[in-house]
Design a protein with these regions (language model features):
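A well-structured
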Residues: 1-222
């Protein structure tokens, strides 16, 4: 399915509204999530979940692609921040389902898994995080914190490093390359070219070592 024509595309704004309405509908299922839930109702609930999360993923993917194409584009930066915030808000509104599913007893979980069809792998993977899941209130706080914490730091890092240009000698000619282009060279079969590519990367990154180091430390400590 295509993404969007641009940030001014009517379909782009309409997608936000469709996700909002989908999340609102999904919240009406909360009281129906009981251990003895029928397979039919369970499938209808996760199908509804899939519908609006697919649209949300399109929004997220489109904003990220626009940002990756030009990390200095302020419109793209603003939309990445907007979609990231929106994603966290929707996730907080519908988090109750994943928490319920992780906490469900094994017998009923197995019963529902047998009827889950294409959702089977996703549901199994979700339960693998049971031991690392906090309370709903705590998980919501982490979601909100990440918007202005690690996610913002990652975007700052990308904005800084994607501006870099690297000088590498190729076939006797000194060429100026982008980060993506020079990164591709580190997988070339020619060992000398790989070495020059790595040296070019390290030389440029070293120039911003203090600020990049601070970003790394902040992400690790977050």
């Amino acid at each position: 399915e295509d993404l969007f024509l641009g940030f001014d595309d009517h379909a782009y704004e309409a997608a936000f509204e469709e996700v909002r309405k989908g999340a609102q509908r999904f919240q009406t299922f909360r009281d129906q999530l009981v251990p003895q839930i029928s397979e039919e109702l369970f499938l209808s609930i996760i199908t509804e979940y899939e519908h609006y999360t697919r649209i949300l993923s399109r929004l997220f993917g489109f904003s990220q692609l626009a940002f990756a194409a030009d990390t200095q584009d302020q419109a793209a930066q603003a939309q990445v921040a907007r979609v990231t915030q929106f994603y966290a808000e929707i996730d907080n509104q519908t988090m109750f389902f994943s928490l319920w599913w992780k906490a469900l007893d094994n017998e009923n979980a197995e019963r529902l898994l047998k009827a889950s069809g294409d959702f089977h792998y996703w549901l199994v993977a979700m339960r693998n995080f049971k031991a690392f899941t906090l309370s709903e209130a705590e998980e919501k706080i982490i979601n909100i914190k990440d918007v202005t914490g690690v996610n913002a730091l990652n975007m700052l890092y990308e904005s800084i490093t994607n501006r870099y240009l690297f000088k590498v000698e190729i076939d006797g000619e000194l060429k100026e390359l982008t980060r993506g282009e020079v990164t591709a060279l580190v997988r070339e079969p020619d060992p000398d070219l790989r070495e020059r590519a790595y040296q070019a990367l390290f030389k440029v990154y070293e120039g911003d070592a203090p600020i990049l180091g601070k970003i790394y430390q902040a992400i690790v400590r977050d």
